[in-house]
Amino acid sequence: MNNSDIKALIAKIILFSLIGVAFWLLTPNAGLITYAILVLGAIIWLIYETAQKKNRHLIKHGILMGIFLMIFDFIVENIGFFAGLWTSPQSLYSVISVPIEIMALTLIGGTAWAIHLPQKFDKAYVIFESLIFGFFGALGEYLLILNSMMVYTNGWTSVHAFFGYIITWLILFWVWYKVIRKNS
């Protein structure tokens, strides 16, 4: 990992911490503003990444990753919903069980995430990044639960979510480096 990779990891920790503090400060009455904060954060991140000249050649690849993440998340969220593990009861509009705001977040945030990744696969980076997303993903879901935006059922817990996010991010890294970026 080089210095810019370390800075990117630190920037994500800071961004996700700020979002977490905003959720916590608004608890228990945050409601739909939680989704607005997440989507706005993803939009700002995407604007930042695409504004950098060095990243412009990655935009099409990034969009493919965003689409992949949106579809992957849609499938996983619906499987969990129909298995009775969780539900997201509040949304402007849901597609089956997935809030449209989460679909926007995964598309936009997934695109920004892919664009910022190191040029070459880096095992240490993958491990740290997966742990960051595991921790903040589980924490984010916990805060959504506190704000009545999500409900766990039938024994699903934040620990399950933590490992689910880690597995998801390992899959995303594999798709990015072995499929989408393989020939570029």
Where do the model's predicted regions map?
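Aromatic-rich, lipid-facing transmembrane alpha helices and their immediate juxtamembrane interface loops
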Residues: 1-184
